[in-house]
Curated annotation (Swiss-Prot):
Belongs to the universal ribosomal protein uL29 family. The keyword Isomerase does not apply. GO terms for cellular component: cytosolic large ribosomal subunit. This is Large ribosomal subunit protein uL29. Keywords: Ribonucleoprotein, Ribosomal protein. GO terms for molecular function: structural constituent of ribosome. It comes from Rickettsia massiliae (strain Mtu5). It holds the Pfam family Ribosomal_L29. InterPro entries: Ribosomal_protein_uL29, Ribosomal_uL29, Ribosomal_uL29_sf. GO terms for biological process: translation. It comes from the Bacteria. The gene is rpmC.
Amino acid sequence: MNDLKLLRSKLSTETIEELYKNLNLLKKELFNLRFQQALGELKNTSRFLLVKKSIARIKTELTKRSNSEEY
């Protein structure tokens, strides 16, 4: 639970460019995880959930920032 608070505070301090960079890295990692799963090489399937949630958190932060700029 404490790690989640640290992650959220880290996301709020990063620039938009850093957020997009991290988002692209996580999307590539998710692609690689899916590829490994298809080949039967994936050992840690729980990593899927962590990567997907991290992507969602970054997208939420980007949406929050874009909405705050509009008003």
